[in-house]
A protein has these predicted regions:
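Charge-dense, helix-prone N-terminal extensions
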Residues: 1-122
């Protein structure tokens, strides 16, 4: 996947917005104002195609053991975030999409019932 495919997949999810809250190169995807994915555009330009995604702690451990391209989240809470190297030889596009959906769903499930209702009504 290239950055445009990642971006298109993320923004196609219900209630997702994209931002640059930290600087002009850190692209952040939020659902209902909560981050579920972020990446450095500089890294993509330099061939380091990485994205940070939220992940269930138990699943994080399993994924890190199984895939060379999945590591503890860089500059993130290592228990709840993974850095996924999208162009790693052991990471398929389908797996990237699956992990984006997992991250999105984790964040949505953590929203208050009121905000979940607002999201459903979009």
């Amino acid at each position: 996947m290239d950055i445009e495919q990642v971006r298109d997949f993320c923004v196609a999810k219900k209630g997702v917005t994209e931002h640059f809250p930290f600087d002009e190169v850190t692209l952040v995807f939020k659902v209902m104002h909560k981050i579920f994915a972020l990446t450095s555009l500089n890294n993509w330009e330099n061939g380091e195609q990485k994205i940070n995604l939220k992940c269930d702690p138990d699943k994080s451990e399993e994924l890190r053991a199984e895939y060379v391209g999945i590591n503890p989240g860089w500059h993130m809470n290592k228990k709840h975030w993974n850095t996924v190297t999208v162009n790693s030889s052991d990471i398929s596009d389908d797996l990237v999409r699956e992990l984006i959906v997992h991250s999105y769903n984790l964040v949505v499930n953590g929203l208050t019932k009121k905000i979940q209702k607002e999201l459903r009504e979009l």
